[in-house]
Amino acid sequence: MAASGEARRVLVYGGRGALGSRCVQAFRARNWWVASIDVVENEEASASVVVKMTDSFTEQADQVTADVGKLLGDQKVDAILCVAGGWAGGNAKSKSLFKNCDMMWKQSMWTSTISSHLATKHLKEGGLLTLAGAKAALDGTPGMIGYGMAKGAVHQLCQSLAGKNSGMPPGAAAIAVLPVTLDTPMNRKSMPEADFSSWTPLEFLVETFHDWITGNKRPNSGSLIQVVTTDGKTELTPAYF
């Protein structure tokens, strides 16, 4: 980890999404160097890697890996925050099952896998990799098959990265955050009648990431951290199996 007061360097995968944009803004405001990785550029970031859309995972993974390599050279980063993702519903009978499963896999597992590989190449010793899981995927998700499968795979990946000989740098931590619902403009628009006091503010996760990057209250590598908000109060609770 960087010395106290030293400017950090962070990659935000999904840096133009609701949470990713907030991470970029908050860490740039602290004068950190922040690069965004997304399908469109984030002009507020120190640098952007634009992901080319393709149906080939290997093509996309190779493109992002190469472009990040050109951007960083031999510079290491303190953290890689994978906050890319999305949501789609549908049970196993749904006409949109295959389309939604494909979309969920691309948004969650492609991004998480690429982020994990980037961590092996560019993360500092003692650095932080965060992945975007989901509390719902700790159990069956019959009404959102594709979403549950993809998030369940993210959880498994996180635990694998914490194991011996995973390829992660010495002392580095892989941690998955498992929220219920994030308080984003898109979610408010799609669920205007919902109880917003049970939704997690984006600022809470941004500050949580800041704590973990700076070594404050960082959970053990492999932790699946449930993020639950009740009556406007958010708590972090590890999931155990």
UniProtKB/Swiss-Prot annotation:
Q: Which residues are NADP(+)-binding?
A: 11-35
Q: Which domain of life is it from?
A: Eukaryota
Q: What Pfam families does the entry give?
A: adh_short
Give the molecular function GO annotations: 6,7-dihydropteridine reductase activity
Which residues are responsible for catalysis? 147 (proton acceptor)
> Keyword Oxidoreductase, does the record have it?
yes
Instruction: Alphabetically list the UniProt keywords.
Output: NADP, Oxidoreductase, Tetrahydrobiopterin biosynthesis
**Annotated GO biological process:** tetrahydrobiopterin biosynthetic process
**Any single Gene Ontology cellular-component annotation:** mitochondrion
E.C. number, please? 1.5.1.34
Gene3D superfamilies with a match to the protein in the record: NAD(P)-binding Rossmann-like Domain (3.40.50.720)
What the entry lists under InterPro entries is as follows: NAD(P)-bd_dom_sf (IPR036291), Sc_DH/Rdtase_CS (IPR020904), SDR_fam (IPR002347)
Give the sites modified to N6-succinyllysine: 70, 76, 93, 99
Q: Which reaction does it catalyse?
A: 5,6,7,8-tetrahydropteridine + NAD(+) = 6,7-dihydropteridine + NADH + H(+); 5,6,7,8-tetrahydropteridine + NADP(+) = 6,7-dihydropteridine + NADPH + H(+)
Tell whether Oxidoreductase is among the UniProt keywords. Answer: yes
Q: Which principal EC class is assigned to this enzyme?
A: oxidoreductase
Subunit text: Homodimer.
Describe the family membership recorded for this protein in Swiss-Prot or TrEMBL.
Answer: Belongs to the short-chain dehydrogenases/reductases (SDR) family.
Its biological purpose: Catalyzes the conversion of quinonoid dihydrobiopterin into tetrahydrobiopterin.
Protein name, per record: Dihydropteridine reductase
- Name its species: Mus musculus (Mouse)
Q: What is the lineage of its organism?
A: Eukaryota, Metazoa, Chordata, Craniata, Vertebrata
Encoding gene, per UniProt annotation:
Qdpr
